[in-house]
């Protein structure tokens, strides 16, 4: 083990020949020093220029006695692009020509020997992400996608993110309620109605939509066993095929209304309704990008070819290119169109509770990774059918801003409570500024103590004056022989 040395008393001072002085020199007086050892791409110079604009030219160029650059060619080119005329320089006069050549290599290589502590870096970036910065963290030189990866590594990937609260029998939320969940919003509203999004979005545009609409399949006996779960309030097997297609068109049109050109729509669906989904996409002019398959790793109900997958259709709104945060693994994220995430099929108390709370609940990591693929930190993401609030939790963890609608007040409550449990913060009712707890107490009081109702004035009359005498109809029955 190497221990730190303390300076000896009477240790010699640094020789004057090794003391460094910063001088400012015109760019025009500086020249290249030997072979160019590092290759700078255009985006590298752009990143350096962005850093200089924000932090200033705080790292001087290193030059020899003839104004030849030893280190800092990239910074010099960035300064030229910014129109800077004079730059800070340190002249290395104590090294001979041979040592300068060796130093040029060492100075560029030694800094790369140490690796990053990814967990510590992730925590630092996570802390910075919580601050309302006036600039992007990609000024650090890391891409936005890499920053997302570091942050997720720093926080452990979302412990307890899939924990679901109990579904209430008497919901607090009511149709029309808009809840503010920190940076997110959840509205108890119909996802097919245009006016729902006037309240929810207030003119905002959406980068990505991830939604898991009802499949128009009866829950009882198909998705879960008999009696485990109530039916959805809409599209739970009661619609004809044409009606379900019309329903899908309306919902998909709302997504298309608010997506930015090039924004992606992730539309979860089962294999039975592939044609309905494609018909809705055609009717709303959405372009198909890919078809992803969620591999649940275990089969569900059924006796013939038990299903262990669900489909996630990926559509794009025309008029722009979609945001690609994968780029064939360039940023450390390797993705294909087969997504293997453990589902709630199989055994175990935790999975049984998840099935009981919501029959088609998606793993938070599945939704989060889709948001990481197609959006940036701070972007607005939309879920038309919020259900248990998984998209809201995924947005919370990935530093996106979720906007969600859910028609069933019970599931609105689940989404609110789940977010509160996960973050430790309180949801606020937009209309009154009250917390969820305060609204719950107030509405319980209203139910427990309804306003008095005046008794109606009754007039007693003789039934013989009003009602005719009953007519008795006698049917003759044949006598037994």
Describe each PLM feature range.
Residues 16-412, 481:
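Core catalytic lobe of class I
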């Amino acid at each position: 083990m190497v221990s730190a040395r303390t300076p000896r008393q009477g240790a010699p001072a640094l020789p004057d020949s090794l003391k460094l002085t910063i001088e400012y020199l015109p760019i025009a007086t500086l020249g290249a020093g030997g072979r160019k050892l590092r290759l700078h791409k255009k985006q590298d110079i752009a990143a350096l220029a962005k850093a200089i604009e924000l932090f200033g030219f705080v790292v001087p160029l290193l030059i020899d006695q003839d104004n030849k650059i030893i280190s800092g060619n990239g910074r010099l080119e960035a300064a030229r692009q910014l129109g800077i005329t004079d730059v800070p320089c340190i002249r290395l006069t104590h090294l001979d020509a041979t040592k300068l050549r060796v130093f040029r290599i060492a100075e560029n290589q030694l800094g790369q020997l140490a690796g990053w502590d990814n967990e510590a870096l992730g925590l630092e970036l996570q802390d910075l992400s919580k601050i309302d910065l006036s600039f992007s963290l990609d000024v650090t030189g890391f891409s936005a996608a890499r920053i997302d990866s570091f942050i997720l590594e720093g926080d452990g990937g979302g412990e307890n993110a899939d924990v679901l609260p109990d579904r209430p029998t008497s919901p607090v939320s009511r149709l029309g309620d808009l809840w503010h969940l920190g940076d997110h919003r959840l509205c108890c509203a119909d996802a097919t109605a245009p006016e729902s999004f006037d309240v929810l979005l207030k003119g905002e545009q959406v980068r990505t939509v991830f939604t898991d609409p009802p499949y128009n399949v009866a829950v009882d006996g198909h998705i879960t066993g008999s009696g485990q779960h109530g039916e959805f309030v809409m599209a739970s097997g009661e619609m004809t095929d044409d009606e379900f297609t019309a329903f899908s068109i309306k919902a998909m049109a709302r997504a298309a209304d608010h997506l930015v050109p090039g924004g992606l729509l992730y539309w979860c669906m089962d294999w039975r309704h592939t044609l309905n989904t494609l018909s809705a996409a055609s009717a709303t002019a959405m372009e198909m990008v890919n078809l992803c398959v969620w591999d649940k790793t275990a089969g569900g109900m059924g006796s013939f070819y038990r299903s262990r997958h669900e489909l996630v259709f990926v559509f794009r709104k025309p008029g722009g290119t979609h945001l690609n945060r994968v780029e064939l693994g360039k940023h450390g994220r390797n993705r294909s169109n087969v997504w293997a995430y453990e589902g709630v099929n199989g055994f175990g108390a935790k999975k049984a509770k998840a099935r009981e709370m919501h029959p088609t609940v998606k793993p938070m990591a599945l939704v989060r990774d889709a948001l990481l693929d197609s959006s940036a930190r701070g972007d607005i993401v939309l879920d038309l059918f919020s259900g248990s609030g998984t998209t809201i939790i995924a947005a919370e963890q990935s530093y996106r801003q979720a906007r969600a609608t859910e028609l069933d007040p019970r599931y609105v409550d689940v989404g609110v409570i789940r977010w509160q449990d996960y973050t430790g913060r309180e949801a606020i009712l937009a209309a009154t500024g009250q917390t969820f707890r305060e609204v719950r107490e107030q509405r319980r009081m209203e139910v427990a103590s309804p306003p008095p109702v005046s008794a109606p004035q009754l007039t007693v009359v003789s039934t013989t004056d009003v009602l005719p005498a009953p007519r008795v109809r006698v049917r003759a029955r044949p006598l037994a022989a």
